[in-house]
C-alpha cells in the first residue's frame, strides 16, 4: 500500500522532476529525494511528509478549541474531507485544495481575532511614535503604560516574556501602520500580498512552494517578516538583506544567523561577508533613526532583550508550570532550549556535508523545550530559511504547469475567504471583567483566600482560572488558586484559595497581580495589600505623551 501511495504521490504532485542519464530526483515541498541520498528514500520521505501535514492539522485544530462549537465542527469537517481524499480516494490533488481551504479558514481566524501580544507591543510603539515620543522603553515600563489600543493580553506576558523582547526598528514603523490603519486591515494586506508573491513563485520558480505555503500558513499565519523572507527567496543573492529586515521586525530571526553563516561558508568566505554585510545593512536602515534619537536607550533595549532568553509559556507543560501545576523553575526551559540549540549548531557545522539537506530539522529539535514557540514561530523563520536556503535541488529544473481552471480554483480558494465574515471567530474573545473585593489575611499575616466579583459577557466562557503572581517573586509562580466551572453570563462571585489547603501565597504588606484567564486571554488587576487586609484594586496607568 505504501509503495502504491509513493507511486501515486510521485505521479500526482509532479512538483519538480529532474531527469538525467544517471539519476532522477523528486522534490516534495521541503524534501529532495534521489537514489544517491539514502536518508531521503521515497518511502521514508513520503511518511515524513504525511507526518508533518498531520502535525500541522493537530496544531491547527488544537488552537481552535477556544472557538465556538461551529468553528470546531467546521475545522473537523475540513480535516475529514482532506483525510478522505488523501488516503481513501487517493486523490492527492483534491486533498491539496482542501488543505488550502483549511489554511484559508485558519487565516480568517488570525485576521479577525484580536492581536497577539507582539502585535500589541508594536501598536503601542507606533502609538508613541505618532505622538512624537521615543518608543524605546524597558518592557516592564511598556506594560505599565499599557493603555492602547486593546485591553486584552496573553499569558506570555508574565513569567518574563515582555521583559525580554523589545521591538526593533522595523517593528516600530510597522506598528505605526497597524495603529493608524487598524490591525485587521494591515493583516489582510499582508495576507493578500503574500498570496500573490507565492503564486508568482509557484508559477515561475518551483511548484515546491505549493505544499510549503500550505504548511507555512497552517502553523503560524503570515506577518511582515514572512513576506520579507519570501521576497528574499525570489532574490536569492540578497538573502542576507531581507534576513536583516526580518530581524528588524522580530528578533527571533536571529536564530537563523549561525546556520546561514555555516551554509554560506560552503560557498566561500566572500559570500559570508557579503551576506553578513547585507544583513547588517538591512537591520540598521530601520534602526538608525532611533539610534540617533537616543543611542543609549536604544542600545540598552537591544542588549537587554538579546541577553535574556524568552520564557516559554504556552501550549505545553511550561504553561502548566506557569499556572502552578508543576513547581519547575522557568530557567529549566531556558537552559534546555539553549543547550539543544547550541548542540544543533555544532552538529550542523561538523556534519555539514551529511546533514545540509536536513538543516530545517535542527531548530525544530531545539524547540522541544519551547512547544509554544514551535507552534507560533516555526513558520516565521524555519521554512523560508531552511527550505529555500538549504534544500536546493540540483540540475535543470522543469517547472510543472497548472491548468487554467485549476489555477482559478486555487486562487479563489485562497483569496475569497478573506472577504467573508469570520465564521470561526463568532462570539470569541468577548471580554470579562473582574475585581477582587476582599483579601483574607491570617493570624500571622499570611494571605489564604481572596473574594472575586467577575462579570461574564459571553455564553461561550465556561471556565475561568485565577492565578496570583507575587510581584516580589514573579518568575517562579506556584500559585494557581482556583479554576471555576459552570460560569454564567452576568455576575459571578468566587472565593479563590490555593490548590493545596496548606499552601499560602505569601505575606501581608506585599504587592500581587491577580490574573483571570479564559481561553488564551485575560484582564489584569493589581493588588496592594496593607496591614489590615484591605487593598487597592483595578489599578490602571495612563500613558504619558
From Swiss-Prot:
Organism the protein comes from: Acidianus two-tailed virus
Location (main, coarse): host cell
List localization entries: Host membrane
Note whether Transmembrane helix occurs among the keywords.
yes
Spell out the GO cellular component terms annotated for this protein, sorted alphabetically and separated by semicolons: host cell membrane; membrane
Is Glycosyltransferase set as a keyword in this record?
no
Q: Report TM segments.
A: 48-68, 69-89, 94-114, 181-201, 209-229, 242-262, 279-299, 336-356, 368-390, 404-424, 510-530
For this entry, the protein name equals Putative transmembrane protein ORF545
Membrane topology label: Multi-pass membrane protein
Q: Which key words are in the record?
A: Host membrane, Membrane, Transmembrane, Transmembrane helix
